[in-house]
């Protein structure tokens, strides 16, 4: 018989949620949190689930994917959502919280739970037994070394360098063409051709665009590999024309001529509903990203489902390493949760902890572990991070581009109606799992 205790490493959003899901099912939890014994550069308190950036958990309405995700989590008795609803402050259509009340609620619930033993110490290695690793983007160097030994050198990353991801339905297919450079292999990229005049306008706007200021502990990330395309642009037009926007081998089949510049879009999920901009990792402010991207032919009305980011982040190559149950492929008793798995955002991190906690509990009970349907946001997130292209894997937030298309839906359906149908389908589906 399996042991009746689970070790949860990290009391952030994911670890706190995982610990709650285990404890409420009668399972003993050893919850390890190194703060305040060892602080991170971003944390300021010893409370669990401290929100280190914004106090907003984003949109609350069901016309947004993250709003649907929240409702699914409420259905499954999420501690994080219980805390957020209790500590909410006025924020229009968003769910924002008093961050101290929010973290205090979670800390009190876990510290006072009879099935939770809190250890304020740093774990430097992955222990034996059933373990959930939820140490977040600022995982300590010693534990990072242990993770690297487990995952392998090439499967642990220390920063995000992600290009924006677009909703494929909002790309103007009349202005782009499908082609791979020099026609090698199958035609795998959508290409957005630019004239010299279009490129000049794009370039001038790009070099004027505002960037997000880097935090002190993030200053080194540009030197580790991927350079933001706005930094390339500062080196001159030709840096882009010989870099991510080079047109060689990409003649436009409509004209037979080579464009002056080309922006390539790579399919980002197996369903072909999402596309990322190749080589466009960026640190521009989000409003600027939208403005600049919409200067590209074919993308004038493109919806960005995930903005480009560059920031400090410890995460694993989940497509290579994880099952959709959040278990490691090579060790069934080891689970991962939170931003470390490649989910992006407060709510998404907590959601992964919720499923990891439920599945660790099912393992102890000798029950079949749960993989939620892709029609749910919880299921679609788990599916994405474990089936995405491992060679180009970058963290992802909740969006409707991850869920299966609607059956029998008219092609010209309005976006809001489509989203409403996605939401209704997700919430009907999650009801079947409310007694997990």
Swiss-Prot record:
* GO BP field: tRNA methylation; tRNA wobble uridine modification
Is Amino-acid biosynthesis included in the keywords of this UniProt record?
no
Any single Pfam family the record assigns to this protein: GIDA
Describe the reaction catalysed, as an equation: uridine(54) in tRNA + (6R)-5,10-methylene-5,6,7,8-tetrahydrofolate + NADH + H(+) = 5-methyluridine(54) in tRNA + (6S)-5,6,7,8-tetrahydrofolate + NAD(+); uridine(54) in tRNA + (6R)-5,10-methylene-5,6,7,8-tetrahydrofolate + NADPH + H(+) = 5-methyluridine(54) in tRNA + (6S)-5,6,7,8-tetrahydrofolate + NADP(+)
Q: Which UniProt keywords apply?
A: Cytoplasm, FAD, Flavoprotein, Methyltransferase, NAD, NADP, Transferase, tRNA processing
Positions bound to FAD: 10-15
GO MF annotation list: flavin adenine dinucleotide binding; tRNA (uracil(54)-C5)-methyltransferase activity, 5,10-methylenetetrahydrofolate-dependent
EC annotation from Swiss-Prot or TrEMBL: 2.1.1.74
The cellular component terms of Gene Ontology attached to this UniProt record, alphabetical and capped at eight, are: cytosol
- The question of whether NAD is a record keyword is answered with yes
Chief place where the protein resides:
cytoplasm
Subcellular location, in the record's words?
Cytoplasm
Q: What class of enzyme is it?
A: transferase
Report the domain of life of the source organism. Answer: Bacteria
User: Which cofactor names does the annotation list?
Assistant: FAD
Query: What job does the chain carry out?
Result: Catalyzes the folate-dependent formation of 5-methyl-uridine at position 54 (M-5-U54) in all tRNAs.
| NCBIfam families linked | gid_trmFO (TIGR00137), PRK05335.1 (NF003739)
List the HAMAP family hit by this protein, alphabetically: TrmFO
Family, similarity comment? Belongs to the MnmG family. TrmFO subfamily.
Question: Protein name, please?
Answer: Methylenetetrahydrofolate--tRNA-(uracil-5-)-methyltransferase TrmFO
